[in-house]
């Protein structure tokens, strides 16, 4: 069992029950999945970009991402239907907790001029989105072997009903919020 998973069961659940007054353990919000998405609009010109991005995302997530394709053609962006335009990986279970642990304890402190993550990036339904500008904050990525700095979107999906519950859940996982 992952370190954060044990921490969730032993410390987070009792803390949230006390804070929000849940009657059942099953009411306590939990993280269901973490989705990593890398948009690669520049991949239209060069197919090697997709391979490099898939390699980076595989190292970061620990599992192979799926290549996302364009749903419809957009002439202004020189994209045809079916063109590969990104890579996405969904983490659940133990891999999800291990990624979250590495992200909070190792990757976020490596961000340049890091002052904490925004507390306003919730979607109104208890899910949290964070954008990472460079993939080199992850220790799995070797700085000398990358061809370009690429950002990625990290979407944390929870069972929380409100943003306050989700923020309390992530804060109990030692998420470094600004305010």
Swiss-Prot record:
Q: Which Gene3D superfamilies match?
A: 3.30.1440.10
One Pfam family matching this protein:
Ribosomal_L5_C
Question: Its Gene Ontology molecular function terms?
Answer: rRNA binding; structural constituent of ribosome; tRNA binding
Is the tRNA-binding keyword given for this protein? yes
Q: Which GO terms describe its biological process?
A: translation
Q: Which UniProt keywords apply?
A: Ribonucleoprotein, Ribosomal protein, RNA-binding, rRNA-binding, tRNA-binding
Superkingdom of the source species: Bacteria
Report the GO terms under cellular component: ribonucleoprotein complex; ribosome
Q: What HAMAP family does the record point to?
A: Ribosomal_uL5_B
Family that this chain belongs to: Belongs to the universal ribosomal protein uL5 family.
Question: What PANTHER family is this protein classified in?
Answer: 60S RIBOSOMAL PROTEIN L11-RELATED (PTHR11994)
**What's the stated role of this polypeptide?**
This is one of the proteins that bind and probably mediate the attachment of the 5S RNA into the large ribosomal subunit, where it forms part of the central protuberance. In the 70S ribosome it contacts protein S13 of the 30S subunit (bridge B1b), connecting the 2 subunits; this bridge is implicated in subunit movement. Contacts the P site tRNA; the 5S rRNA and some of its associated proteins might help stabilize positioning of ribosome-bound tRNAs.
Q: Give the record's subunit note.
A: Part of the 50S ribosomal subunit; part of the 5S rRNA/L5/L18/L25 subcomplex. Contacts the 5S rRNA and the P site tRNA. Forms a bridge to the 30S subunit in the 70S ribosome.
Q: What is this protein called?
A: Large ribosomal subunit protein uL5
């Amino acid at each position: 069992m992952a370190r954060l998973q044990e921490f969730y069961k032993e410390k987070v659940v009792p803390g949230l029950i006390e804070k929000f007054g849940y009657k059942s353990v099953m009411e306590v919000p939990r993280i269901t999945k973490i989705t990593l998405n890398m948009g690669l609009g520049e991949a239209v010109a060069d197919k090697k970009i997709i391979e490099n991005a898939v390699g980076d995302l595989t190292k970061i997530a620990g599992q192979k991402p799926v290549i996302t394709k364009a749903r419809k053609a957009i002439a202004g962006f020189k994209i045809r239907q079916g063109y590969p335009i990104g890579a996405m990986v969904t983490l659940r279970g133990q891999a999800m907790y291990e990624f979250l642990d590495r992200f909070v304890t190792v990757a976020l402190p490596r961000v340049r001029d890091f002052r904490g993550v925004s507390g306003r990036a919730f979607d109104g339904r208890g899910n949290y989105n964070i954008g990472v500008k460079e993939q080199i904050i992850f220790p799995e990525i070797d700085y000398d072997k990358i061809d370009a700095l690429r950002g990625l979107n990290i979407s944390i999906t929870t069972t929380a009903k409100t943003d306050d519950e989700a923020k309390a859940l992530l804060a109990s996982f030692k998420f470094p919020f600004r305010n």
